[in-house]
Amino acid sequence: MFQPFVNEPYSDFTVPANEAAYRVALAGVREQLGTHYPVVIGEESVETKRRIESVNPGRPSEVVGSAAGADAELAERSIEMAWLAFAGWSQRSAEDRGRHLVKLAALMRDRKYELSAWETIEASKNWLEAEADVAEAIDFVEYYARQAVRLAQPIDVVAYPGEENESHLIPIGAGVVIPPWNFPLAILAGMAIGPVAAGNTVVVKPASTTPIIAAKFMELVQAAGFPPGVINYLPGAGSEIGDVLVDHPRTRFVNFTGSKEVGLRIAERSAHVQPGQLWLKRAF
């Protein structure tokens, strides 16, 4: 169904045309600085009183933009919306889910330098590192599209006389994705798209220092035609919504990359069974 997987190539910025194109992308991004981005839960864009201001760490006086700061109530709503979307998304074929992923990868590829420029400004990555992060994000999306189709097939089991046995992998529900600031697109995409490819749904709580790159990713998710609620964008302070998302009795899994301290906290809290919780959580 899909062409064989090939890694996204890197650009050679000693080529004048590539250098010029990246400078154009940087100029275009600078024209968008200061834009505000709302929480996205399903089809709804939600404004809040609290705002998270993002600044260029290499030039702290430069405001990159702002994102709405979600509270505990919105965290609850986002989990419920993810479960509503799971009912339909989990029933789609792996091929259909894969097509959504391939469309997303194509959109990311079309805006590769723009996304890289956002990383240069919001995360202070140099050109090579910024583009490498975006290329890795595209690789994750393309790779998981193909893996979704492969893993949808029955798994070989040991034959036993007199029995007919099959083993299948199935999606498990709604989860939470908490990516770091230093690889704000690649790790976000990898931790979010893997579960989504398998038929799960997610709530993405981006790092508070790089919420704008995550907002741009969310725009592409919407443009790619993903059903509302499959991926939800929930910027907010970890101290305010982190425990709510991790502790929620309907959170099935937590994908986290970050500090040892926070990782141990998530692992510990995920192990506690909450009232009304039906399954043990999985913290990765």
Regions found by a protein language model. Give the residues of each.
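Glycine-rich loop-to-alpha-helix module at the N-terminal edge of alpha/beta enzyme cores
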Residues: 49, 55-152
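Generic beta-strand/beta-sheet core signal
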Residues: 55-57, 118, 133, 144, ...
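Secondary-structure transition/capping motifs at alpha-helix termini
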Residues: 90, 110, 147-152, 198, ...
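Hydrophobic packing residues within well-ordered alpha-helices of enzyme cores
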Residues: 141, 214-217, 245, 266
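Hydrophobic face of amphipathic alpha-helices that form TPR/SEL1-like repeat modules
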Residues: 1-59, 63-64
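Conserved small-residue-rich beta-alpha loop and adjacent elements
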Residues: 154-228
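Conserved NAD(P)+-binding/catalytic subdomain of aldehyde/semialdehyde dehydrogenases
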Residues: 161, 169, 173-178, 223-284
